């Protein structure tokens, strides 16, 4: 965009002012044009030769038309508050003598008033290696003096290390042998790497770096060194206090343990039945309380733990009181040595709820899908149980058929002991099969 504007300005001035000298110095972008000549360095000549261009310049002084050879010389003066990090050298970087070029003198005129110590050829203010007043002033003189900035920085860091080593020895003598050991370790760390040093060491060197020249000797910095060592002493006393607290007495920590099943629930099987009685407010368990205990608290983790021993206790009841009919589950078999643990979400239902759902479906009160939505039993499991009881399975298991035949004469005795009518109805249906 700048190039187009410059070309337009060059063409306009070449058409209007044909009396200008074409051999006048021009920018590198407009050298291809033979008759191109931008605005001259003297504004009086531009106003006398080209009144239209003078009006444009008076209307907008910051426009790209104002980029001339004169402005390119004083270009660093416009970047007073900007830190130039480019690798190119400014026109005044090569001049190291006291007499500067006009471009360099304009930077000091437009910027902040510099001190006479800044015009020294080595860029230093005192003999101990203190850098210029600020980093911005150092870059304003050019990157030719960048090598002189690195050595004073190392020198200032060395000064801060010497001051801190003196204060460490004095504080270590007051703290005792443990303090000597701690301070010695910290001193080794501070000498090994720059990243291992605390923040206040660099702040001390930065204060020395950005000082106004009054702090030129080590003897001028005892107060600052003491202040810089004070937060270190406070930090170390805080750490020592924490160590004493850690070594004083063991603290009771609650460590979370991952456990699948609490074995203490097995010894308290009687408490499982009193759990629902506390919830329902009655001492005896009814069929409704068992149903609510198995269906409703599925979301709670405590009820998840209750589901395992609860079903085991109900299976133990069934094995002691006797089963009116065999089931396909291994849990219901009295000959099984140990009841099988429930696996997955499809075994989170209770066996009593399963029996009630099977009896409701077999009596014709509900369909399989309706019983699935109400009792929370999977459709395939409920359908298989119903077909197994009705004898409509295509491939009935041979082992279950043998158990049914062996338990056939004992069913009549078990019916009298069973108080539920649903179990009696299902037992009669199994006898008819």
Swiss-Prot record:
Cross-link Glycyl lysine isopeptide (Lys-Gly) (interchain with G-Cter in SUMO2): residue positions: 254, 414
Leader peptide range in chain numbering: none
Start and end residues of each HTH psq-type domain: 340-392
Polar residues biased stretches: 13-34, 88-110, 316-329
Gene3D superfamilies on file: Homeodomain-like (1.10.10.60)
Chain intervals for the UniProt region annotation (Disordered): 1-147, 299-348, 393-412
DNA-binding region, residue range(s): 368-388
GO MF term list: chromatin binding; DNA binding
Keywords: Activator, DNA-binding, Isopeptide bond, Nucleus, Phosphoprotein, Repressor, Transcription, Transcription regulation, Ubl conjugation
Any GO BP annotation: transcription initiation-coupled chromatin remodeling
Phosphoserine found at: 42, 63, 249
Keyword Repressor: yes
Motif (Nuclear localization signal): 339-345
Any single GO CC term annotated in Swiss-Prot or TrEMBL for this entry: nucleus
Subcellular locations according to the entry: Nucleus
Tissue: Detected in heart and kidney.
Sequence motif: Interaction with nuclear receptors, positions: 53-57
Pfam families: HTH_psq
Residue ranges with Low complexity bias: 36-48
Subunit structure: Interacts with ESR1 and ESR2 in the presence of estradiol. Interacts with CTBP1, HDAC3 and HDAC6. Component of a large corepressor complex that contains about 20 proteins, including CTBP1, CTBP2, HDAC1 and HDAC2.
Primary role: Repressor of ligand-dependent transcription activation by various nuclear repressors. Repressor of ligand-dependent transcription activation by ESR1, ESR2, NR3C1, PGR, RARA, RARB, RARG, RXRA and VDR. May act as transcription activator that binds DNA elements with the sequence 5'-CCCTATCGATCGATCTCTACCT-3'.
PANTHER family per the UniProt record, alphabetical: LIGAND-DEPENDENT COREPRESSOR, TRANSCRIPTION FACTOR MLR1/2
Entry protein name: Ligand-dependent corepressor
């Amino acid at each position: 965009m700048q190039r187009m504007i410059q070309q337009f300005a060059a063409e306009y001035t070449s058409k209007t002012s044909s009396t200008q000298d074409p051999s006048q110095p021009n920018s590198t972008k407009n050298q291809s044009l033979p008759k191109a000549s931008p605005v001259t360095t003297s504004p009086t000549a531009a106003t006398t030769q080209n009144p239209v261009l003078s009006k444009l310049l008076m209307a907008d002084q910051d426009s790209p038309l104002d980029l001339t050879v004169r402005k390119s010389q004083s270009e660093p003066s416009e970047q007073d508050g900007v830190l130039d990090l480019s690798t190119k050298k400014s026109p005044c970087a090569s001049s190291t003598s006291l007499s500067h070029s006009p471009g360099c003198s304009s930077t000091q005129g437009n910027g902040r008033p510099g001190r006479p110590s800044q015009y020294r050829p080595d860029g230093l203010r005192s003999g101990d290696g203190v850098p210029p007043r600020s980093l911005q002033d150092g870059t304003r003189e050019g990157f030719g003096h960048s090598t002189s900035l690195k050595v004073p920085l190392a020198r200032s860091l060395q000064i801060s290390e010497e001051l801190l080593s003196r204060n460490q020895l004095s504080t270590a003598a007051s703290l005792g042998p443990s303090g000597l050991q701690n301070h010695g370790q910290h001193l080794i760390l501070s000498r090994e790497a720059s990243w291992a040093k605390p923040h206040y060491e660099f702040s001390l060197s930065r204060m020395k770096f950005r000082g106004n020249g009054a702090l030129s000797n080590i003897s001028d910095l005892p107060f600052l060194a003491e202040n810089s060592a004070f937060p270190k002493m406070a930090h170390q006393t805080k750490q020592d206090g924490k160590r004493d607290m850690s070594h004083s007495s063991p603290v009771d920590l609650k460590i979370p343990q991952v456990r699948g099943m609490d074995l203490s629930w097995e010894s308290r099987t009687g408490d499982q039945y009193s759990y629902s009685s506390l919830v329902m407010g009655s001492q005896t368990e009814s069929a409704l309380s068992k149903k609510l205990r198995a269906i409703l608290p599925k979301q709670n983790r405590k009820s998840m733990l209750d589901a395992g021993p609860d079903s085991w206790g109900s299976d133990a009841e069934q094995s002691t009181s006797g089963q009116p009919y065999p089931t396909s589950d291994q849990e219901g078999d009295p000959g099984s040595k140990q009841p099988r643990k429930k696996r997955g979400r499809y075994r989170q239902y209770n066996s009593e709820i399963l029996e009630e759902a099977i009896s409701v479906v077999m009596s014709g009160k509900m369909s399989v899908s309706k019983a699935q939505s109400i009792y929370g039993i999977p459709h395939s499991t409920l359908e298989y149980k119903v077909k197994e009881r009705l004898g409509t399975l295509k491939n009935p298991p041979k082992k279950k058929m043998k158990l049914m035949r062996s338990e056939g004469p004992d069913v009549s005795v078990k019916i009298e002991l069973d108080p539920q009518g649903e179990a009696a109805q299902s037992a009669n249906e199994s006898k008819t099969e």
